[in-house]
Swiss-Prot record:
Quaternary data: Homodimer.
Cofactor(s) this protein cannot do without: Mg(2+)
Name used for this protein in its record: Phosphoenolpyruvate transferase
EC number annotated for this UniProt entry: 2.7.8.28
Associated pathway: Cofactor biosynthesis; coenzyme F420 biosynthesis
Organism: Mycobacterium ulcerans (strain Agy99)
Pfam families: CofD
Taxonomic superkingdom: Bacteria
Name of encoding gene: fbiA
GO terms, molecular function: LPPG:FO 2-phospho-L-lactate transferase activity; magnesium ion binding
HAMAP family tied to this protein: CofD
Keyword Lipid metabolism: no
Length: 329
């Protein structure tokens, strides 16, 4: 079976880990596995930024580190056993920004990526090269090789004027607490999905939307030209997972993002925001948490346990989605 999943960062990476657990891939593979299954992740790049002259791709790296067994288990991002000597020395020099943490081990990834970008390699090819070191057991595809950054229009606390700041500054520095007016996906007017991504969607047996942030993760992927068309054209069933349980995001600040675009923080509202593929949206199936309700025209809805407490629990989420779509593994 070919499974293609649209993902963001920490939550998306954990969802992929559960898919690997179910399919016997990556760190869950055994000598008896005969590669019957393929897992491909279409990864958000809206969080990507230039920091200290280096190209940072947080969601790609979080997926790569998580599936490769090297992620920091407490934070859910960055390297295990990280050190911070470079960050401390930069602070002594007074270098800005001082609110974005880059660990010493993590810096190596960004240095390699930046060198390859400056040598003319596309991001998809660079990601493949980086994954050679980590062996994630899945194909990780940036949604585009082009610049597609999420920026946020806020009220500047210094002069009370509206201005756009990078998503990372809004999310990390200000913790999404500034008065916020809108999101802008910079670069999407000239960007396009890679041919590898559109092929992964077209050739999939099943497509899933992970329970990542519906605005700045999945939403940023959907904003890239070519993605919606590929989803609407694929013969594969499309199964979405709610990131909202009992009116609250499982992690992160999805509620702040949803509020900005005028969508309620409920499983039903997020499902309606994605919309039915039978109409103008992208969903065939929508899974919500036990106790949550959702009615979405032309979308089949089922309630299941949705807490990704460990890979086995997440594997059962993936299994439930496949069963709902009539797919067995």
């Amino acid at each position: 079976m070919k499974l293609t999943v649209l993902v963001g960062g920490v939550g998306g990476a954990r969802f992929l880990l559960g898919a690997q657990r179910l399919l016997g891939l990556g760190q869950f593979a055994t000598p008896d596995d005969n590669a019957r299954h393929e897992l491909t992740a279409v990864v958000n790049i809206g969080d990507d930024a230039w920091i200290h002259g280096l190209r940072i791709c947080p969601d790609l790296d979080t997926c790569m580190y998580t599936l490769g067994g090297g992620v920091d288990p407490q934070r859910g991002w960055g390297h295990r056993d990280e050190t911070w000597h470079a960050k401390e020395e930069l602070a002594r020099y007074g270098v800005q920004p001082d609110w974005f943490q880059l660990g010493d081990r993590d810096l190596a990834t960004h240095l390699v990526r930046t060198q390859m970008l400056r040598a003319g390699y596309p991001l998809a090819q660079i990601t493949t090269a980086l994954c050679d070191r980590w062996q994630p057991g899945a194909t990780l595809l940036p949604v585009s090789n082009d610049r597609c950054e999420t920026h946020v229009v806020v009220t500047d606390p210094t002069d009370q004027q509206q201005r756009a700041i990078h998503f990372q500054e809004w999310w990390v520095r200000y913790r999404a607490e500034l008065p916020t007016h809108s999101f802008a996906f910079i670069g999407t007017e000239t960007a396009s999905a890679t041919t590898e991504v559109t092929a992964a969607i077209a050739d999939a047996d099943v497509v899933m939307l992970a329970p990542s942030n519906p605005v700045v993760s999945i939403g940023a992927i959907l904003a890239v030209p070519g993605i919606r068309a590929a989803l609407r054209a694929t013969r594969a069933p499309i199964i979405g997972y709610s990131p909202i349980i009992a009116g609250k995001p499982v992690r992160g600040m999805a509620d702040a993002c949803l509020s900005v675009i005028g969508v309620d923080t409920t499983a039903e509202a997020v499902g309606r925001h994605y919309g039915a593929r039978a109409a103008t949206g992208v969903l065939d199936y929508w899974l919500v948490a036990e106790g949550d309700q959702a009615e979405i025209d032309s979308v089949t809805v089922r309630s299941i346990p949705l807490l990704m407490s460990d890979p086995e629990a997440t594997a059962q989420m993936v299994r439930a989605g496949l069963e709902l779509a009539g797919v067995t593994v």
